[in-house]
Amino acid sequence: MSKRGRGGASGAKFRISLGLPVGAVMNCADNTGAKNLFVISVYGIRGRLNRLPSAGVGDMFVCSVKKGKPELRKKVLQGVVIRQRKQFRRKDGTFIYFEDNAGVIVNNKGEMKGSAITGPVAKECADLWPRIAANAGSIA
């Protein structure tokens, strides 16, 4: 769970099961032209020997585009996780998971590069990132 370095995030972040370790590839859910995002590192993870840093819903991470527009590929970018397949527990006791892992490309202030998001955005992510919530079609 990232505790530091969440750029434009607002509010407190609760413990969420981390489902996307370094090396994971997820869908890009915005309209920037990127198809896949490859996780390079996760902001705010201090870590432990031999443990891979992992990201969960609402975490900001460093990524690169593996498939998509040529002008986005082979560059180091920032992204935020908006959905994950690994289930996590909400404060009301319910467990939730999504059918895919997805993220969006943001700048270091937390503002989206794209202008629209396909599919739902987790409520935990929308609470932390107001600019992502503004572009979300639905919040689950």
Curated annotation (Swiss-Prot):
State the name under which the record lists this protein: Large ribosomal subunit protein uL14
Q: Kindly state which keywords UniProt assigns to this record, in alphabetical order.
A: Ribonucleoprotein, Ribosomal protein
- The gene for this chain is rpl-23
Family from the record? Belongs to the universal ribosomal protein uL14 family.
Query: Matching PROSITE patterns, A to Z?
Result: RIBOSOMAL_L14
Organism, by scientific name, is: Caenorhabditis elegans
UniProt cross-references to SMART domains, sorted A to Z: Ribosomal_L14
The UniProt entry, under Pfam families, shows: Ribosomal_L14 (PF00238)
Q: Name one GO molecular function term.
A: structural constituent of ribosome
Any one GO CC term of this protein is:
cytosolic large ribosomal subunit
